[in-house]
Amino acid sequence: MFSKLTSILQHAVEALAPSLPLQEDFVYHWKAITHYYIETSDDKAPVTDTNIPSHLEQMLDILVQEENERESGETGPCMEYLLHHKILETLYTLGKADCPPGMKQQVLVFYTKLLGRIRQPLLPHINVHRPVQKLIRLCGEVLATPTENEEIQFLCIVCAKLKQDPYLVNFFLENKSKSLVSRGALSVISEDGPKGQDPGSGDVSQCQQPQELSGATGVEPTESEEEPPHQMDDLSASLDDLNVTSLPEASAVRPNQDYNLVNSLLNLTRSPDGRIAVKACEGLMLLVSLPEPAAAKCLAQSTCLCELLTGRLTSLYKALPQSVDPLDIETVEAVNWGLDSYSHKEDASAFPGKRALISFLSWFDYCDQLIKEAQKTAAVALAKAIHERFFVGVMEPQLMQTSEMGILTSTALLHRIVRQVTSDVLLQEMVVFILGEQREPETLSEISRHPLRHRLIEHCDHISDEISIMTLRMFEHLLQKPNEHILYNLVLRNLEERNYTENKPSCPEDKDVVENGLIAGAVDLEEDPLFTDISPDNTLPNQEWICSPRTSPDHPKNDGKTEVHKVVNSFLCLVPDDAKSSYHVEGTGYDTYLRDAHRQFRDYCAICSRWEWPGAPKPLEKCDLEAAFFEGHFLKVLFDRMGRILDQPYDVNLQVTSVLSRLSLFPHPHTHEYLLDPYINLASGCRSLFSVIVRVVGDLMVRIQRIQDFTPKLLLVRKRLLGLEPEGPIVDHITLLEGVIVLEEFCKELAAIAFVKYHASATP
């Protein structure tokens, strides 16, 4: 009470007294602080019971006022005094000793406000950046301390200053070889790591030491400096009496270069206060984005950031229940790493493990965004660490297991993070993890060369329909990612030589016949008003190739519309009229696929535009047509499943045809020829998508004859699928009937894709 009254009286006296020049006023407030330590006999009283906070605030106000009154960039006498007399060094010492109690908090606030409110660059001064660096080491030493909030605010203002002037980061890459001791190693390797873990044990030993940054700072951060000014002798002696300078530091030797700003932030990411942890993550996000190569190298090699990311991913993944409903994994709300707040009591759609799932997806999102923002060197190092320690070390064993429930859950999680990833660097590591790096053509005897790829493709044809559907969905989303290696590894590498074709002249008259009969009831594209809906303004840039036969050197060149007319009708007329039901139901015509096909093709063209794909198929005379053709493991499984479309569940058929339609959308001449050209001369023993469908139709025509009332039953099933008819008694041959409906719709979709591609390439 008495100290508060004293403070009030002091403010009153200062207000009534004549104003002093700024420098005298500044020195007065500083000496008032130093005199406290010289004269005090009670070092147990909290700092809030003294006038120290008021004097520090007055000093800040004077520095700000001085800067506002002077020319931009000019250093005033008060700032000169602060720098010359090493006031920040002294405050650091007082804060480290926390004398009087609460002084550390006051020092952190002073540093934070000084860096935040003063516009001129302070960090290049050795008497600023060195005490700042020392104060950084004090942050995050102990979690859940009363100063945690001030610590994170101080660290974040330092990060913000480095973001403004990235070269300043070199002042914070400490050369530890000249130091005898430094603080102990961090314990942020994993969530379970004990505080103060021995630096020679566990994952800490994996933090490599980078080469020293010679001359990076321009200032040698030696410990020997000029003697402090004479007027500070009394204060120094008093501090000695208070044992401020005798506090021991840990004796563990750090690497040659240390990035303590990162280390302190890493510690604070483990704070039990979620707001502090998020702020620490934001600070790390700023640091990894700095363009300085030396800082990026030090961050990747001399800090435990990689261990933090992978360790927490691992622990959160392992905390998930052994089995989670795939639908829950797929539909859980979009997760943003900074908004990882979840209340089970307030959630009407809660399910077992939702809290753990959101935590895992939230942290994965943070890793993804961190790598996306990071400088290239740091981004690659972080992504490779996640690949090796999390994808291979944790996820792969789960994906390779034999338990159906385990396979389903782990595949659903893989599917979710494939959908979620946005960083190109992390996506590349994920693609290599799933598919491997192979780019040479596949052979049947070597399809298991990359075990995980082989296992996942095999799961597309698993005895469990749920596993098949989930794996197919994962591949479908993978194919939508902007990475050239995905399609090349799965499909293109096997089509490079076009050895699925036989180089022989074709007969023009053969084009008027489809393999299951004449083109009856063909759609006249030129008279259909729906084709004019895709205006020239909405088309893609002109391509050198189109998906109709006129692009192939094997076929005579006719009028383009005639050729695409025949291609479209080849697909539309594959399913015999007796097996068609869409024309009985309004709104299910072929035209319904045109808009979707146009939008999807435009999206794929945007993705693939930077991959420098050829504008036309490789000339046959340059192809090795004698080499044995193998469509590749992925297409083999898809074609096999397509061949069984009449005997598979409806949901499986939908997913198989969805993946095949995705493949047919890619603007590469070889995939178009192989998947969308009905007229290619297939080499002996080879099959294409069209030929697979033709075999299915042949089987269908035989089986139709054995089913009574086939057409009425087919129409009833279609209406039930569309919700136009209520569910009733089970219809005989329901699997076959649903397969026929999917087949008809798939042929219409392929016809629409073929036309949209022709239209896009033919429009000037």
Swiss-Prot record:
Q: Where are the transmembrane segments?
A: none
Q: According to its UniProt record, what is one Pfam family this protein matches? A: KELAA
**Signal peptide (from-to):** none
Q: Spell out the residue ranges making up region: Disordered.
A: 190-236
Q: Where is the composition biased (Polar residues)?
A: 203-214
Instruction: Name the InterPro entries for this protein.
Output: FHIP, FHIP_C, FHIP_KELAA_motif
Task of the protein: May be required for proper functioning of the nervous system.
Q: Which family does it belong to?
A: Belongs to the FHIP family.
What is this protein called in UniProt? FHF complex subunit HOOK interacting protein 2A
